[in-house]
């Protein structure tokens, strides 16, 4: 970090054993380790050995496993260290409640909602990697952040890029934002070719190193659809101001178009640690060891319009934006449920979008989210509908 007077920053990482979490800790190492950050709490799911190793290395005050059944294993792994151990939702809430000025919200899926909201309520600055907070509960979540008084710094490379491109600019001068998408491993595949795709094939991303959920979301472009909804809330945009362009090289991470016809873009190597570092050091920048761009070797940068016929996730995301209400929650919960069924081999790759659209149509009734209870209720309903549709497809197969 560039300003030692603010060191160390107190940091809690919700989801330290996942892809974002492990990269966050690598950034912490590069930015001074314990001299740069005081790790208050680390949370993980089933990888107890890694969680315990992280807690010991960084001297965390609290280590939490989200799995109640893994409590004794974690307690045993950290015996004699003086590190407090907790488990389950109560443990996640305790971690989010600790006196950390910065919280990395990296628990994937709906389970990350409650602890992230807890951190927001107490006024922590949130480095947001959890998409569900905005996709499912956008208005409610933003209201909570505002009331708590903390800042919201995006961690997704695309939203981090937009955030940086907007710095120092007039909001009224923004004409549109353009999120870039690599196109994933199936960018040039036909729907017939995609019909027989397995999870192992879908997880192989051409540019980025990511976890299973995000990798498959990139292949289906549901990940980009969720990012469209996130962008609307993060930057207070109309649905028609959010665009997507396919950029196979993943060098331009996103851009902002202004009313005078100019564009500002953020470029960099496809390494999520850059956006993580920016979120953890904002408004400064850290000294990070990542691959630098060599512009002389960048022979070309390609762009193409996304094909929504082959990748309907983008159309469904725009539909959720235009309909509003609880459609984001319905899309997210249905997609998450369909993803698990696809990974388990119960449905095909193309079935995911079909299931999501059917669930969204069933729940298109004008309801809005006034409280988190409304969001959780919609989430539960969407999952129930999705499971019914999945069961029908499994039976037919």
From Swiss-Prot:
Database matches in SUPFAM superfamilies: 1-deoxy-D-xylulose-5-phosphate reductoisomerase, C-terminal domain (SSF69055), Glyceraldehyde-3-phosphate dehydrogenase-like, C-terminal domain (SSF55347), NAD(P)-binding Rossmann-fold domains (SSF51735)
EC number: 1.1.1.267
Cofactor: Mg(2+); Mn(2+)
Reaction(s) catalysed by this chain's protein: 2-C-methyl-D-erythritol 4-phosphate + NADP(+) = 1-deoxy-D-xylulose 5-phosphate + NADPH + H(+)
Binding site for 1-deoxy-D-xylulose 5-phosphate: 131, 157-158, 182, 205, 218, 223-224, 227
Chain positions recorded as NADPH binding sites: 17-20, 45, 47, 130, 132, 211
Top-level enzyme category: oxidoreductase
Any matching Pfam family: DXP_reductoisom
Pathway(s) annotated for this protein in UniProt: Isoprenoid biosynthesis; isopentenyl diphosphate biosynthesis via DXP pathway; isopentenyl diphosphate from 1-deoxy-D-xylulose 5-phosphate: step 1/6
Binding of Mn(2+), residues: 156, 158, 227
An example molecular function term from Gene Ontology annotations: 1-deoxy-D-xylulose-5-phosphate reductoisomerase activity
BP-aspect Gene Ontology terms: isopentenyl diphosphate biosynthetic process, methylerythritol 4-phosphate pathway involved in terpenoid biosynthetic process
UniProt xrefs under InterPro entries: DXP_reductoisomerase, DXP_reductoisomerase_C, DXP_reductoisomerase_N, DXPR_C, DXPR_C_sf, NAD(P)-bd_dom_sf
Sorted UniProt keywords: Isoprene biosynthesis, Manganese, Metal-binding, NADP, Oxidoreductase
NCBIfam families the UniProt entry points to: Dxr (TIGR00243)
Family membership: Belongs to the DXR family.
Family annotation (HAMAP family): DXP_reductoisom
Described function: Catalyzes the NADPH-dependent rearrangement and reduction of 1-deoxy-D-xylulose-5-phosphate (DXP) to 2-C-methyl-D-erythritol 4-phosphate (MEP).
Name of this protein: 1-deoxy-D-xylulose 5-phosphate reductoisomerase
Gene source species: Agrobacterium fabrum (strain C58 / ATCC 33970) (Agrobacterium tumefaciens (strain C58))
């Amino acid at each position: 970090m560039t300003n030692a007077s603010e060191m160390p920053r107190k940091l809690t990482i919700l989801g330290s054993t996942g892809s974002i979490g492990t990269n966050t800790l690598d950034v912490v190492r590069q930015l001074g380790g314990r001299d740069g950050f005081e790790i208050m709490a680390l949370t993980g799911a089933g990888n107890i050995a890694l969680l315990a190793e992280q807690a010991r290395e960084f001297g965390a005050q609290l280590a939490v496993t989200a799995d109640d059944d893994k409590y004794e294993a974690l307690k045993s792994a950290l015996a004699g260290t003086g590190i407090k151990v907790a488990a389950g939702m109560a443990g996640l809430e305790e971690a989010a409640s600790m006196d950390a000025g910065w919280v990395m919200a990296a628990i994937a899926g709906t389970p990350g909602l409650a602890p992230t909201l807890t951190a927001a309520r107490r006024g922590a600055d949130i480095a947001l990697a959890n998409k569900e907070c905005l996709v499912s509960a956008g208005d409610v979540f933003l209201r909570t952040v505002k009331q708590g008084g903390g800042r919201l710094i995006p961690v997704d490379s695309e939203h981090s890029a937009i955030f940086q491109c907007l710095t120092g600019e007039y909001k009224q001068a923004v004409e549109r934002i353009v999120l870039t998408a690599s196109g994933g491993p199936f960018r040039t595949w036909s729907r017939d070719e995609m019909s027989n795709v397995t999870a192992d094939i879908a997880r192989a991303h051409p540019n980025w190193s990511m976890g299973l959920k995000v990798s498959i979301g990139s292949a289906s472009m549901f990940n980009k659809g969720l990012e469209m909804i996130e962008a609307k809330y993060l930057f207070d945009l109309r649905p028609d101001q959010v665009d997507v362009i396919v950029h196979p090289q993943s060098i331009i991470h996103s851009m902002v178009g202004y009313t005078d016809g100019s564009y500002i873009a953020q470029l960099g190597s496809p390494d999520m640690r850059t956006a993580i570092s920016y979120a953890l050091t904002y408004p400064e920048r850290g000294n990070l060891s990542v691959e630098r761009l060599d512009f002389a070797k960048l022979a070309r940068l390609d762009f193409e319009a996304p094909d929504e016929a082959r990748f309907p996730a983008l159309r469904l995301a725009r539909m959720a934006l235009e309909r509003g209400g609880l459609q984001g929650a319905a899309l997210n919960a249905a997609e998450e449920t369909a993803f698990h069924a696809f990974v388990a081999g119960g449905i095909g790759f193309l079935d995911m979008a079909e299931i999501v659209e059917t669930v969204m149509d069933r729940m298109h009734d004008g309801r809005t989210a006034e409280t988190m209870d409304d969001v959780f209720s919609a989430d539960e309903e969407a999952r129930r509908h999705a499971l019914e549709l999945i069961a029908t497809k499994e039976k037919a197969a």
